[in-house]
Amino acid sequence: MYIRRTTIRSRQTGQPYYTYRLVESIREGGRVRQRTLLNLGRHFAVPREQWAALVQRMEHLLGGQPDLLPAELDTQWEEAAQRYAAQLIRTRASVQEGRAAEAADYQSVDVDSLELLRPRSVAVEHVALAAVRQVGLDRKLAALGFNGPQQGAAIGTLVARMVAPGSELATHYWLQHHSALGELIDYDFLGLDLMALYRISDQLLKHKGALEGFLYAQERTLFDFEEVITLYDLTNTFCEGTAKVNANAALGKSKEKRSDCPLVTLALVLDASGFPKRSEIFPGNVSEPKTLAQVLGKLTAEHTGNAPTVVLDAGIASEENIAWLVENGYRYLVVSRKRHREFDPDAAVLITQGDALTIRAQRRVNADTGEVELYCHSSQREKKEQGIAELFAKRFEAALEKLAEGLHKKGTVKRYEKVLERLGRLREKYARAAQYYEVSVEQDPASGKTTAITWQRTKPIAETLPGVYCLRTNEADWDEATLWRTYTMLTDLEAVFRSLKSELGLRPIFHRKTDRVSAHLFISVLAYHLVHTIRFQLKAADIHLSWEGVRRELAGQDRVTVTLKRADGKTLHIRKATRAEPRQQVIYDALGLSDRPGRTEKTIA
C-alpha cells in the first residue's frame, strides 16, 4: 500500500487542487495496475515525509500488531493511522456481509493475541437515532435541502445534545472520540470540521418554524392524541460573559438566581401530552404577560376545530391576556392573581387524599364575570406557607435582637430617631411577620438615645386561609376534579424546563451572537422533542424513568473491535456491540429495538 497524490481541476472554477488516495498495486493478466483502497480527500494533512511511516503503521494495525510503532512516524499522526486502518477494515468487511448469519464460522486463532480496540458508546445513541427516524426528522432534513454531510452533522448535533450536552467544541470531541454514532449512520465524524457544527446550528435555526410544525404533526400522528389543552410558560437562562453583541441578552430577574449575568428568555407552548408545539426566544428582561399574544397568535390560524383550553400561571394571567384569549376564541384556566381567598371546608369536594397530600376544592360562579372560580386547599401548600411564615418570624426576631444588642456596643445606632427609622425598615422588610408583634422602644430624654427595645408576639402566626389558592376559568362544564387535574399539568411544563436545563444543556450559554444563542436554545428544544418521544413510549410500557435515568441504565454498552491472529498469519478483525445487559434489554424491548446496535463487521487482513 502507498499514498498517491493526484491533481484535479475544479469543474466550477477551473482551478487545480490535489486529492489523496491510499492505493495498492495488483497484477492482473500479466499487467500491474493500481487499486484504490481509500479516498483520503483533499484535506489530507499528513506531510509527505510521513507517508511511508503512516502506511507501515496501518499495516501493523491491520496485521494485529497494534503495539508496534515505526520510529519514523510522529506520535501526532498515530490517531490518523488508527482512523484510516479502521476505515479500511470497514470497507473490506462490507464485502463479506453477504454470508448467512446462521452459518457457523470456525477459525484457528491464537487466543493470546486477542486485542480489544476502539471502544465507543452506542446504546443511548442507538435509542436516540431510532427516535430521529421514528419521527421522520432525517427525511425532513433532506426535504429542506440538507445534503448528506449536513444531515450527518445535524443528527450528530442533536444526538450529542441528548446524550452528552455541551459546547460545540465538546460535542465535536465526543462525536470523534467517544461515540459510535458515526457507525450507525455511516458518517465519518473524524473528518468533520469543528466549524461545520456552528454552521449546522445556523441552518437548523433557519428552518425553525418548519421543523417545529413538522415534528408536532408527526408526534400527533404517531401517538394519536387530541389537541385539547395548551400549556404556556416561560423560563430564562444565563449567558457567560457580557454578551454585548447579543440583542436578546439583558439583565433581569433570574429564575436560577444568576441575576449577575445577562439573561435570555425561552417561551414554550406544550400540549397536554407534553409535546412542544412552538417555542420563542425573548430578551432576558421581557415582561412575561406581554409575550402571550405574540406566541399564541401564531398558532391561532393553525386551529382547524375548536381552539384548545389554555392553561397559564399567575405571572402571565393578566386581565389583558384573558381578554385576548376570549377575543380569539380560546377557553382558559388560569391561576387567579387576586389576594382575597375564600374557602368553606363543608362545601368543598375531596379531590385526592394521601399521606403526603390532600386536596379539597370548592367551586363557585362569579356573579360579576360569569367565570367559574375554584378555591383549592392543599395540605402540602398549607405546611409550606406556615413554614415560610415561621421562617420570616425568626428572621424578624433575629433582626430585632441584633438591633437591641447594638444599643450596648460602640459605633452602633443608638439615637432614638435613627432606631425608629431602622425599626420601620425592618417592619417593611418583614411585613408578613411584623403584623404579629408589638415592639416597644424606650428613650432616655436627657441624652436622646434609646435605652431598650422589647417585643412580644401578640397573636399566633397564622396566614389567612393558609394553603388556599384560586383558579379561574370559562370552562363552565368541567367539574372540580377535572379543573384541578388540568391545572396541575403546569407542573409537567416546569419539569420540561428542568429537563432542558439539567439534562439537555440549555444552560449556561457560551455564545455571543444573537443567532448562535437562539440556535443553542432551539437545538435543546429539538432534542427535547426526541427525548419526549422516547419517554412517552417507555411510560406506555410502565417504565417511568427520567431522561437522566434512561441514560444511566443504557450506559455501558459499547461497540468494540476484537483482533485475533490466525494460524495462517493473517489477522481476524471483528467489530460489534457488546451484549445488552438485562436492564438495557428491558428498554430495547419497550421501544421495539434490536439489542445489538450496528452491524457485525468481520475482516481478515
Name what the model sees in each region.
Residues 2-4, 12, 17-21, 29-30, ...:
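Anion-binding and metal-coordination hotspots
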Residues 5-62:
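Short, surface-exposed polybasic/aromatic micro-patch for ligand or macromolecular engagement
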Residues 38-41, 74, 89, 115-117, ...:
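Compositionally biased amphipathic helical and low-complexity segments enriched in hydrophobic
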Residues 45-104:
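N-terminal helical hairpins
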